[in-house]
Amino acid sequence: HLGRCIYDGIYVGDDSDIPNVNGMRKDVVDALKEIGVPVLRWPGGCFADEYHWKDGIGPKEGRKKIVNTHWGGVVEDNSFGTHEFMELCSQIGCEPYIALNLGSGTVREASEWIEYMTAPAGSSVANERVANGRTQPWKVKYIGIGNENWGCGGNMDPEYYASEYKRYQQFCKDCGDNHLYKIACGPNSDDYHWTEELMKRINRLHARAISLHYYTVLGNWEHKGSATEFDDKEYYITIQKTLHIADIIDKHLEIMDKYDPEHDI
């Protein structure tokens, strides 16, 4: 929910003059279909660990308005929530990847979100989904437990995160014939210590993957450089930094192989 990525960029609502299908911009959906996006992750970025899913279900006029503290302090009206995201994935033809709130959420909140999305009708949580217009449960394979928890997702050290991750994942259960592929928050760039400590503490019973975070910026984090104004030298520096990710991945894989030689994660 950064800038106009969601609002205006993807979601314009049913009553917009911009051509749309169920609120999703037709031109954007068509472009994403042409690219062939296989998996779409939401809610992305730092917003994930301050997002509370119950704020984004039910009639839009009754949804809770919050301040998006990470991205501009703008008011987030939660008109794009779980049902809207699943509609977007359906239109694109891709798999949803849900990022659970570990930073400011609770185990119960995470568990009930999975139940809301994937459990057959019958429980109070699943029945609420039905009341909100979705009779059949969705198929949700990919579940990320926390986002960038070494930074905006809670400023955690890897030992603490691993402990919290294992606690959360224990209550993220398969519902019916929906089987979860649980993903732990991986390191920031070349933080090999994070990978080492995380891999010491988890195994395939806890996680199927870890997510590596890497950003290509021309300068440093405070002075990233312009996205539209740059010379040839700056362009090639950016490409060089982008290619460096291959070396970083290889070093993280070496650490993972030490603790997981069978490549279960």
Summary of predicted features, one role per range:
Residues 1-209, 241-265:
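Non-catalytic accessory regions flanking glycosidase/transglycosidase catalytic cores in CAZymes
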Residues 151, 221-239, 262-265:
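Active-site clefts of carbohydrate-active enzymes
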Residues 207, 212-220:
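Anion-binding catalytic surfaces of enzymes that hydrolyze or transfer phosphate/sulfate esters
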